[in-house]
Amino acid sequence: MSIFPIVLALLLIGLEETEALDGYPLSKINNCKIYCPDDDVCKWTCKHRAGATNGKGDCIWYGCYCYDVAPGTKMYPGSSPCYA
């Protein structure tokens, strides 16, 4: 039996969920969602890291998940910005 399938499976499991540059995990479903431990951190993360605003500079978040990433924002190296 080859060890290759086992190694490949472990790699794929590890790639299911990645971390953003600030260490918070990106959602598996929608990279626009950013988990934050509390409202203050969530607001700061939306405004400074994700650029998640309503076009007026106000941060948009719900349940400590940030949405509506501004155009041109890089969520993770090599990935395109997403729009909620």
From Swiss-Prot:
UniProt KW keywords: Disulfide bond, Ion channel impairing toxin, Neurotoxin, Secreted, Signal, Toxin, Voltage-gated sodium channel impairing toxin
Origin superkingdom: Eukaryota
Range of residues in the leader sequence: 1-20
TM region(s), chain numbering: none
Compartmental location: Secreted
Disulfide links within the chain: 32-82, 36-59, 42-64, 46-66
Molecular function GO terms recorded: ion channel inhibitor activity; sodium channel regulator activity; toxin activity
InterPro entries: LCN-type_CS_alpha_beta_dom, Scorpion_toxin-like_sf
Tissue: Expressed by the venom gland.
PROSITE patterns: LCN_CSAB (PS51863)
Domain LCN-type CS-alpha/beta per the UniProt entry, residue ranges: 21-83
One cellular component term from this protein's GO annotations in UniProt: extracellular region
Stated family: Belongs to the long (4 C-C) scorpion toxin superfamily. Sodium channel inhibitor family.
Domain description: Has the structural arrangement of an alpha-helix connected to antiparallel beta-sheets by disulfide bonds (CS-alpha/beta).
Free-text function comment from the UniProt entry: Inhibits voltage-gated sodium channels (Nav).
Protein name per its UniProtKB record: Toxin To7
